[in-house]
């Protein structure tokens, strides 16, 4: 069985994603307003960094959950996670 998110982790991730969603809406508005490229790019990079932190939180949770699995099952889950991470 693949690791799943508990209530607390789910809420933390959803909160982070909602903030990122707001950042992206703000970037869209900046583009519509024809704001300077450096200002837009700064916000794009901030949103990207926030999204990368969400990914890191997911990976950390996955590893923590795998530690509680039987070794062979944990290995399969971790191998799959590495495949997904290196695919990008």
Give residue spans per PLM region.
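Solvent-exposed interaction patches of small proteins and small membrane subunits
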Residues: 1-88
């Amino acid at each position: 069985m693949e690791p799943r998110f508990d209530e607390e982790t789910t809420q933390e991730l959803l909160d982070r994603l909602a903030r990122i969603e707001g950042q992206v809406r703000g970037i869209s508005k900046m583009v519509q307003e024809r704001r300077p490229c450096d200002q837009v790019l700064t916000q794009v990079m901030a949103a990207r960094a926030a999204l990368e932190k969400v990914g890191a939180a997911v990976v950390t949770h996955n590893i923590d959950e795998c530690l509680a699995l039987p070794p062979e099952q944990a290995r399969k889950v971790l191998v799959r996670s590495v495949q997904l991470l290196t695919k990008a």
